[in-house]
């Protein structure tokens, strides 16, 4: 995938909607009073895996051929992306291998395993785990799904903006958290395509 087009976002949103909850906006009286604006939260923590990451993972896997899915999926993560990929792979009956740093909390390891993924502990930090995952991908023919540096993943995450604007067409500002940048890339790009005047930060 080379470009985030409106058509791709629409496709991703339709595919993602099959397996995710459309988390409804929650009005915050407290923050609205504090800011002088109408403030709403989108509670993605209510998704099946506890985070939005499953959106990007599921859409990415949907773009793979049956042959590639049959070979297996791999990623490196110590948190929500691990669970998103594990859950999405399970829905496709695809093998998932998740490489996690050795200091990953046991609760995250067990949660990832609960979705049927094989967990490999390697390295002290994410970069070590990521390097090892790429090595395993090359050795076994797995498809590596990056947590954020992947336009298909970002396109899947962007489905959040589709839901926000569908539910609240008058929204004029979206405040988006940023880590690696996949969520903010997807949300900001789609929001601007749907409403060029909207502000995203």
Model region roles, listed by residue range:
Residues 1-201:
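PLP-dependent amino-acid enzyme catalytic core
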């Amino acid at each position: 995938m080379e470009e985030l087009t409106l058509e791709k976002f629409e496709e991703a949103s339709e595919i993602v909607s099959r397996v995710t909850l459309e988390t409804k906006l929650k009005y915050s009286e407290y923050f609205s009073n504090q800011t002088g604006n109408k403030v709403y939260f989108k509670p993605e923590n209510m998704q099946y895996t506890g985070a939005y990451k499953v959106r990007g993972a599921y859409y990415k896997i949907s773009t793979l051929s049956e042959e590639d899915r049959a070979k297996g999926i791999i990623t490196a993560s110590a948190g929500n992306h691990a669970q998103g990929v594990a859950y999405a792979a399970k829905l496709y009956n695809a093998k998932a291998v998740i490489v996690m740093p050795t200091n990953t909390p046991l609760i995250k390891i067990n949660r990832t395993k609960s979705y049927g993924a094989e967990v490999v502990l390697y390295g002290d930090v994410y970069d070590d785990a990521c390097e090892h995952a790429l090595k395993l991908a090359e050795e076994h023919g797995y498809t590596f799904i990056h947590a954020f540096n992947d336009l298909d993943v970002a396109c899947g995450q962007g489905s959040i903006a589709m839901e926000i604007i569908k539910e609240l067409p008058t929204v004029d500002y979206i405040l988006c958290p940023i880590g690696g940048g996949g969520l903010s890339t997807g949300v900001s790009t789609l929001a601007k395509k749907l409403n060029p005047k909207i502000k995203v930060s």
